[in-house]
Curated annotation (Swiss-Prot):
Annotated gene: scpB
Quaternary structure and partners: Homodimer. Homodimerization may be required to stabilize the binding of ScpA to the Smc head domains. Component of a cohesin-like complex composed of ScpA, ScpB and the Smc homodimer, in which ScpA and ScpB bind to the head domain of Smc. The presence of the three proteins is required for the association of the complex with DNA.
Top-level taxon of the source organism: Bacteria
Cellular-component GO terms for this entry: cytoplasm
HAMAP family xrefs: ScpB (MF_01804)
Species for this entry: Desulforamulus reducens (strain ATCC BAA-1160 / DSM 100696 / MI-1)
Protein name per the record: Segregation and condensation protein B
SUPFAM superfamilies referenced in this protein's UniProt entry, alphabetically: Winged helix' DNA-binding domain (SSF46785)
Family stated for the protein in its record: Belongs to the ScpB family.
Amino acid sequence: MAVLFRDQTKSALEALLFVASEPLTVQALARIVEIDVADALELLLELAKEYQDRPGGLKIVQVSDTWQICTRPECAPYIERLYRKSGTGLSKAAIETLAIIAYRQPITRSEVEMIRGVKVDSPINTLLERNLIEEKGRREGPGRPVLYGTTLEFLKHFGLKDVSELPPLEEFLVEGETIDI
């Protein structure tokens, strides 16, 4: 790929990521700029590295099999002030429920309740409304209970490519504490 064409194509990819309201697949980006998927991926990786290596409020991230431009976490307090919404945080119960679902997915409501020791109807409804979790199917057996798991929105919100990038649970334990998984 010629240098001038390469730079123009990389600029076009950057512009597409900037204006897109949703993450875009490499295949869609390659089709739009009329290059091979492998070349598009190479340019996206270069672009992501450039954003990573320079100071600024933006970064390019891969979320599952899609790409997007997003703000750096350290800019969040300023963005929150711009879009201040009262009561947008998750409750402690919702955060605990989300953590259980993220680490144990797919998991049923009753399994979450067994771990937390309390009903989780309200936290699960909140997480569903915020599109952080979704129904992933049904467990075989009596009643065929719904299985819950995290969404692409969850991955985007926490800046993860996939759930394998979740930090190990051991990082959250106090010295001497154990956890059953």
